[in-house]
């Protein structure tokens, strides 16, 4: 596979054309910063979230799951610092009314207060809180103010003692959660990379102070290995350590895994040592004791340190599409038909695992293909396509990342065999129908991206 640059325009076009992602409320002109996931997009998103969930809660015995409410007591966000500090610096153009994050403007524009779009005068910089504020109940005053959560982590912290008591958890242990978060971003851009409504995959790992550096390094290795496991090209990944000017006030250390998107290297996931800041703050604001009692060490009491892994699910979806996307020349005849667009998804995250394709609609081939599809349905997400030349049908499946195609032809009726085609190599093998499921499972287990 060639390593070449792709444009975001091509990614957006493919996503809309093939039903991965649509602009929200498109018939009304679209809602800025909001996107809908189509039939293939939701399958891909669900597969990515399942892969992450398995990695955390199934393969680690000391991590359990949680699904906390989106609406939380407003004191939660006072304790976390979001009410006071969750802000971005905002400037407006007095002429064209465009809005910008001041820290994202070229220094000369900010210094001279010149709009980069129209040359108009910019306003003074002011703080803009990113939390969506609403009201709960029948009144509309300060007593009914509530927020849409800007992150999922706080739901884990406020349930930390509940989970210790109900599940008899002992440190070190983790709590994993996948859920929606909302941020009133000044500027939403780059398709689904930065949006107002998004999903996070977060795991908070509670450790004894003094062991935090060891666990921090452990989770750095684990999270990098996750992307390797699902076929992401490591030359497209890099670590970025937060400098003193980037490090959050509560963090002891923080690293981002960055991926080279079409717009450059951008954050994909963060691994953070949050110390005991969050639990200490919730102790202060709630009046509840958040100390851990270590019964294995003479009932020693301490507030745990927290190692956080925080990834954007929707951002991961974009990354997997970008990383899988390729345009390949498949023949040397010098015309456009000899190129194919292909998505090299790992089979475990591909929206469709197997497509069943009858060579012809007639002579009972379609009925036989439907029988075979019904057998495969119990094990895999399948598709069925009987329209057009077989070569064009292969191309359609390549374009959405289907790793395996099963072709049913006239020989299938005679000897009960089928052709199994592999997306990446385009090679084909003839196998007995009775061995099809086992062969596909073996291919998935042994899959290595070329």
Where are these regions (language model features)?
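NTP/phosphate- and nucleic-acid-binding module
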Residues: 1-450
């Amino acid at each position: 596979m060639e390593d070449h640059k792709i444009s975001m325009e091509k990614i957006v076009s493919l996503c809309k054309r093939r039903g991965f992602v649509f602009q929200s409320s498109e018939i009304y002109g679209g809602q800025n910063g909001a996107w809908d996931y189509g039939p293939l997009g939701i399958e891909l998103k669900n597969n990515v979230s399942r892969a992450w969930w398995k990695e955390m809660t199934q393969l680690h015995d000391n991590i359990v799951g949680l699904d906390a409410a989106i609406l939380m007591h407003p004191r939660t966000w006072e304790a976390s610092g979001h009410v006071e500090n969750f802000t971005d610096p905002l400037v407006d153009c007095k002429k064209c009314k465009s809005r910008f994050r001041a820290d994202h403007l070229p220094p000369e524009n900010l210094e001279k207060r010149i709009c980069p779009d129209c040359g108009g005068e910019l306003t003074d910089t002011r703080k803009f809180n990113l939390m969506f504020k609403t009201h709960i109940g029948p009144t509309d005053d300060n007593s009914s103010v509530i927020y849409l959560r800007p992150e999922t982590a706080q739901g884990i912290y406020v349930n930390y003692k509940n989970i210790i008591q109900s599940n008899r958890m002992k440190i070190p242990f983790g709590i994993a959660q996948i859920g929606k978060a909302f941020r009133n971003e000044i500027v939403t851009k780059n398709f689904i990379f930065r949006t107002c409504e998004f999903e996070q995959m977060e795991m908070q790992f509670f450790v004894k102070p003094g062991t935090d550096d060891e666990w921090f390094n452990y989770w750095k290795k684990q999270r990098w290995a996750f992307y390797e496991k699902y076929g992401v090209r490591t030359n497209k990944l890099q670590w970025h350590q937060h400098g003193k000017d980037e490090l959050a006030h509560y963090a002891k250390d923080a690293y981002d895994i960055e991926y080279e998107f079409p717009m450059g290297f951008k954050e994909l996931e963060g691994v953070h040592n949050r110390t005991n800041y969050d639990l200490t703050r919730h102790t202060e604001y709630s009046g509840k004791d958040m100390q851990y009692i270590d019964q294995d060490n003479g009932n020693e009491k301490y507030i745990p340190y927290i190692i956080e892994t925080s990834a954007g699910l929707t951002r991961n979806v974009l990354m997997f599409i970008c990383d899988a996307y390729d345009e390949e020349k498949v023949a040397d005849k010098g015309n456009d038909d000899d190129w194919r667009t292909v998505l090299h998804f790992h089979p475990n995250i591909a929206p469709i695992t197997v497509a069943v394709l009858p060579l012809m609609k007639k002579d009972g081939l379609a009925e036989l293909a439907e029988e075979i599809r019904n057998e495969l349905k119990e094990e895999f997400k399948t598709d069925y396509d009987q329209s057009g030349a077989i070569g064009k049908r292969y191309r359609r499946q390549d374009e959405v990342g289907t790793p395996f195609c099963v072709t049913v032809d006239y020989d299938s009726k005679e000897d009960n065999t089928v052709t199994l085609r592999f997306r990446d190599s385009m090679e084909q093998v003839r196998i007995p129908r009775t061995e099809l499921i086992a062969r596909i499972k073996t291919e998935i287990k042994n899959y290595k991206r070329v």
